[in-house]
Design a protein with these regions (language model features):
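Non-catalytic beta/alpha edge segments that cap or flank active sites
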Residues: 1-172
């Protein structure tokens, strides 16, 4: 495989919500469908309650699964008491990727103005797996998918991308 080839990545999509179901979850569906349309394999898509320990357990299980290269969560990135995505995810990071949240908020500013500062979108690497947490709004998921994730999960994106680094993320 060369840097000009596409490589399908194994991806887990988790929606963090106490109110959504797989049938009503438009944001998780948008992410899963967009990733599959790009050629990736969505290995699991599920709804997780806004519970720190259940979310962290699901993240740990996905990280331990060798076929999962990437985990994308949607929801629970705000500032209310039930918004626990960063608290569940960030302690697992071997390396944080602060540029993801910075770029996400920068791009969101064009759509929602200064309200973007309420987003705690985050990303990092844990156990050789890429983890991304994006807000639950469908527009936020669409923007993150189209303007950040699809390019960074594609070997053909130049000058660099996350896909080309996957084999090296677990180096010690």
């Amino acid at each position: 495989m060369t840097a000009n080839d596409f490589k399908a990545l194994g991806i887990a999509v988790f929606t963090l919500s106490d109110t959504r179901t797989l049938e009503t979850d438009r944001s998780g569906a948008l992410l899963a469908e967009g990733l599959e349309a790009a050629g990736h394999r969505v290995l699991t898509r599920s709804i997780l309650p806004d519970d720190l320990w259940q979310v962290r357990a699901a993240l740990c299980a996905a990280i331990a699964e060798r076929q999962v290269d990437v985990v994308v969560t949607t929801g629970a990135t705000g500032i209310t008491g039930r918004d626990i995505a960063p608290e569940a995810m960030e302690p697992l990071f071997d390396k944080a990727l602060p540029g993801f949240g910075e770029l996400f908020r920068h791009l969101s500013y064009d759509d929602i103005g200064a309200s973007t500062i309420q987003s705690r979108a985050t990303a990092g690497v844990a156990g050789g797996t890429l983890l991304f947490a994006v807000p639950g709004s469908t527009n936020a998921c669409k923007m993150a998918l189209e303007k950040i994730l699809l390019g960074q999960l594609d070997l053909r994106t130049k000058p660099c991308n996350f896909a080309m680094l996957l084999d090296r993320l677990g180096e010690r």
